[in-house]
């Protein structure tokens, strides 16, 4: 399994509008990626930790799953990817950093 992560680290004046747009508009484009298995959206969740840790500042983390690196490469070179990149300019306001990363997953338990 290969996952492609897109991390939105920062803030939006309206996180709800950003997430709604992503789910209702952008996800429909991502669904057109060849051989995509799933799209999982991760949002911040309240949590407590008895130890001092550095908290992240991720507003939204999108995880797209593929069976192989070859499937991911096909998706990244597809017309749907170009449409997704164009759609990014229509997102609600967001200030921060967007990073992209592919990782191979291994289920341990």
Question: What are the language-model segments listed below?
Answer:
Residues 1-109:
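Macromolecular interaction modules
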């Amino acid at each position: 399994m290969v996952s492609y992560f897109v991390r939105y680290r920062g803030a939006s004046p309206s996180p709800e509008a950003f997430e709604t747009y992503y789910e209702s508009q952008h996800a429909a484009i991502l669904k057109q990626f060849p051989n995509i298995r799933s799209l999982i959206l991760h949002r911040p969740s309240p949590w407590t930790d008895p130890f001092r840790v550095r908290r992240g500042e991720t507003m939204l983390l999108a995880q797209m799953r593929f069976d192989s690196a070859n499937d991911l490469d096909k998706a990244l070179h597809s017309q749907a990817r170009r449409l997704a990149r164009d759609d990014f300019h229509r997102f609600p306001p967001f200030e921060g950093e967007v990073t992209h990363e592919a990782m191979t997953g291994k289920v341990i338990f």
